[in-house]
């Protein structure tokens, strides 16, 4: 069965964003009712294990029920944060884009190809090239995420870490941005439950409490999409970078690499189980 590094996520984004291109020199697309917006939500360290072992996450489960999903999406190797997010954003593995470590800020290996900004191509820059007027947002909690994207492609970029004073992290910023700007492409990347998994353990009560809290953040983002009046034209994708074991990460076991991947769009088949091997 064919494996894909960026799998359906890249295909859906490319497919959806092609609908926003109105360049006069191109013939109009034959397909109708294509989505106009893509919201990519990332929960760093989210595991399939927690969903199979008691995590409530009602909004997450509703996404699975109303769209397409798999609980067997595998991280790349090594299964740690920066190199996995880079692979999802760039549609290639570390051997090509060159980001190989947990905290990579620049490629440890020379990128196989680079764009005009001397970076390996990523979905944000590629979309900006295709749709110069598009609204593209990037909201993130972990500072390391800033080094994995084409920042020049962003219409809006905000670092909003989760803290005791700000327990919802980047959620308030994302909610306001979605309501005001109705972005064509927006990535909202949380630093949790990764921190709790490393600090307390990937099967700890604290980890399960955190993923349920993140589900409430997901609810707020989904409500914002709805209140912005764009729900029917929006694909929402939820992705995780990796999982760990006990308090570690980066291993080669399926338990450390398996993570969930749901897609939600009102105009597509419900409860669809993604049949292909997926990786990213």
Where is each model-derived feature located?
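Active-site His/acidic residue clusters
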Residues: 143-158, 172-216, 220
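Loop/turn elements at helix/coil->beta-strand transitions in domains of secreted/extracellular proteins
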Residues: 34-39, 66-70, 130-137, 181-186, ...
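Substrate-binding rim/cap in mid-to-C-terminal beta-strand-loop elements of soluble/periplasmic
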Residues: 89, 252-280
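Metal-dependent active-site segment of extracytoplasmic phospho-/sulfohydrolases and closely related
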Residues: 40, 59, 213-251, 262
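Active-site nucleophile/metal-coordination loop of metallo-enzymes that catalyze phosphate/sulfate
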Residues: 26-35, 48-129
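Catalytic-site neighborhoods of secreted/periplasmic enzymes
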Residues: 96-101, 115-166
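Second-shell loop/turn segments in exported
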Residues: 26-29, 45-50, 74-75, 108-115, ...
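Bacterial Sec-dependent N-terminal signal peptides
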Residues: 1-30
């Amino acid at each position: 069965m064919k494996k894909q590094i960026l799998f359906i996520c890249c295909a859906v984004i490319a497919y959806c964003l092609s609908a926003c291109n109105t360049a006069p020199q191109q013939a109009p697309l034959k397909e109708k009712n294509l989505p106009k917006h893509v919201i990519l939500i990332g929960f760093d360290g989210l595991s399939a294990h927690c969903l199979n072992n008691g995590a409530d996450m009602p909004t997450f489960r509703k996404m699975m029920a109303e769209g397409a999903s798999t609980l067997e999406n595998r991280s790349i190797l090594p299964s740690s944060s920066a190199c996995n997010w880079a692979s999802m954003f760039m549609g290639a593995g570390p051997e090509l884009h060159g980001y190989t470590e947990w905290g990579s800020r620049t490629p440890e290996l020379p990128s196989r190809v680079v764009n005009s900004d001397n970076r390996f191509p990523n979905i944000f820059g590629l979309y900006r090239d295709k749709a110069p007027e598009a609204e593209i947002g990037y909201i993130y909690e972990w500072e390391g995420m800033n080094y994995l994207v084409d920042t020049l492609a962003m219409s809006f970029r905000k670092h909003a870490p989760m803290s005791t004073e700000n327990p919802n992290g980047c959620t308030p910023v994302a909610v306001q941005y979605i309501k005001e700007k109705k972005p064509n492409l927006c990535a909202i990347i949380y630093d949790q439950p990764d921190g709790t998994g490393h600090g307390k353990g990937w099967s700890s009560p604290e980890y399960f409490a955190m993923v349920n809290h993140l589900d409430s953040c997901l609810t707020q983002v989904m409500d914002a999409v709805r209140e912005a009046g764009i729900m029917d034209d929006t694909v929402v994708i939820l992705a995780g970078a990796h999982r760990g074991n006990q308090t570690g990460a980066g291993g080669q076991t399926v338990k450390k690499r398996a993570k969930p991947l749901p897609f939600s769009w009102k105009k597509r088949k419900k409860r669809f189980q993604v049949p292909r091997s997926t990786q990213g």
